[in-house]
Amino acid sequence: MRKLKQYSLLATAIAAVLSNQAIAQDEQAKEQKVETIVVSGTAGGRGIRKIDAGFAVTNIDAVKIDKLAPKSTADLLKAVPGIWVESSGGESGANVFVRGFPGGGDAPFLTVSLQGSPVYPAPTLSFLENSSIFRLDETISMMEALRGGPNPVVSNGQPGLTTNFQLKRGSEDTEGTFKYTTSDYGLQRLDAVLSGELSDDLYYMVGGYIKRSSGIRDAGFTSERGQQFTINLTKELDNGEINVYTRQTDDTGAWYLPTPLNVDGVDAEYTQLGTHNRQAVIYAGNNNAMEIDLGEGRGWKGHISGGSIKLELKNGWHFIDRFNLTQGEANTYGLVPAGGAELLKDVADNGQDAKGSVTGTIYEGDTYVQSMGRWVVLKDIESFTNDLAFSKSFDKWESAYGVYSASTSAQDWWSLGNAAYYVLEAGGEMLDGIECNTSVEGCAWNYDINSTGDAKTLAFYTTQSYRATDALTLDIGLRSERHEVNYSVDENLNGIIEKSVDYSARKTSWTIGADYKLADDMGVFARINKGYKMPYFDDFRDNYGTYEAGNPLIKEVTQAELGYKYMGDNTDFFATLFSNEVKGDTFVRRPGEPAEILTNEALGIEFDYNYNHESGLSVNLNATVQDTEITESPDNEGNESQRQPGWQIRVTPSYDFELAGMFATIYGTFSAVDDRYGNNENTVVLEGYEKFDLGLIVEPAEGLKLQIAADNLTDEQGITEGDPRNVDAPNGRYIMPRSIKFSVSYSF
């Protein structure tokens, strides 16, 4: 791998400094172990001590989440080593990349789970990735993030990143938090959570939020609105427990898209969406007019509900069954650029000027305009998953056997394209005097579909662990999965099915690992695995010709890991060297265009470090150094994978102190990222950038907390992506501009 040598000195320096500091901790650290339990990556989710886990997993608790102040679920994933997140599109619609795995957008190698169950079995559909249907609030107690490891064998078989969000639980004590948050962009948000005991051994937790704002990029109207309500009930039994929950969400926000990078005044605060253009009329199918409100943006209106049963049976057997039902609408409305900025005189019918269709303003020929597509995607989704497992511990052997089943459906109605010219300014209006603006066909291409799809997955898996010596543990896992898809699509909204799919495939995934304990608080692990990303509905639509030619559209993922771990009294340090190969990756730049079929490789190392001192100082560091390469491609062999940074680093120091008799914490985050290529051709360079965040927490009285948090303090104008639909257009999507939030909360 070509670039890895350039970063080896950085990686070596980080490893040397952090590991030396870790080893230097006193003997007390070896007696006081951090009993952090992780359930991700374990058969049936029984759980294992983090120090004993032979894989890379990161835990982020509610206290850390509060300090990170993420703007979305995907934004929180930036704190996970090995993960590159583009969260600049708003609360929904993030792009998440895992350890150099290829991707052109969305999050094909991310699974979001709640209480151990996937919220939606398909990691990504067009215009939908898992984080889009999950909202953070005060009901979350912990997030686990497992990369690689045994992932291909358990749960939905995700070979990349599985995040598991755990809900807060009730106890014998009644506890609660009420929190109000506002901001410099007009955010009004109220969070609440309450937990306690309903009766003997029956516990509850209820909570949620209500929010409204005009958006970090001010649209001039309430472009972000939402509410969520969660109930979590737990009944403790003599030999186990029963847990049920439901999470009801209705939350939408503006969809932020690439903007011209070569026009003055268009920066990180800019959004084309506004009062003068949120309403539009488009024509779909047989020239049927449709009135739309682009202000609805992207969102989720639905529920994620489920539960689990955990039992300790006779003869040392354990039983666990986890289930989940997800239903709702994940719609998308947006103003999507259809090319770069142009001068009005070059597109006006008279070659001189044009009139605003809303205000009647006459715009001169030197006014910048841009063709904008009015895109509509209506998506109804539903899924049901069940993961049942039996396990037993013998003298030196642990065995688990499980069966995972999933039923997944999606019904889509799209109208893409519908382009018209708008004045290039915040909230800029459409123009009269440009012929294509009023034509049924619009000013560019159009793509309309009506589709329905159902998928079924049935997998049998087993994991076996053998303690060869007091220090050495070996494990193996196998998974046999059958995946079926039935899908049809009408691509012209004329009632004729152009593409129909009746698909079935079976694959066997595996993992082999070894964990060696160097000391009670220190160890190393090694692992290899092979897994698969099975195709879902849009994979067939995008690659229908390839599918008809006999390609099963399955991405084959092979990984190897070598890791070091240390967990002392006040220091945690994890370093993981990873290597992976992904065969059969497909990339479609725009619906209707031919697919590119690629093989990608990545080699890298990730660091996860936490230090806490009795003086009140704490530091978290996560860093990733990686080299990616396209090893098989018709045109791009030898290039780097698009949108993948060679290195990134994130440092979060925090200091607790007394301020005028009050407990206080000052904290901040410095993050930096390397240059990236915006396309697989490596012709578009996205420059690296640095970002600073700063926050202060003050507790003037018991239970009362005041917090102020500044994001992007220096107002860095970083770019996360170019224009993936038109790489030649000088467009790009900025990171979010500087914003400041203030909250006051009371806990009891």
Regions found by a protein language model. Name each.
Residues E35-L68, G93-N95:
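N-terminal periplasmic "start-of-domain" segments of outer-membrane beta-barrel proteins
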Residues R49, A74-P118:
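Extracytoplasmic beta-strand/coil segments of soluble accessory domains associated
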Residues T73-L76, N95-F97, V112-S113, N130-I133, ...:
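N-terminal periplasmic accessory domains that precede
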Residues P118-R147:
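Short acidic/polar hinge/loop motifs at secondary-structure boundaries
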Residues E175-T177, T181-D267, G297-W300, I304-L313, ...:
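Transmembrane beta-barrel wall of Gram-negative outer-membrane proteins
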Residues T230, T234-E236, E241-S308, N331-W375, ...:
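Acidic/polar loop-and-plug regions of large Gram-negative outer-membrane beta-barrel proteins
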Residues T469, D572, L577-V582, V588, ...:
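Gram-negative outer-membrane beta-barrel transporters
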Residues S671-N679, I697-F748:
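C-terminal beta-signal and adjacent terminal beta-strands/loops
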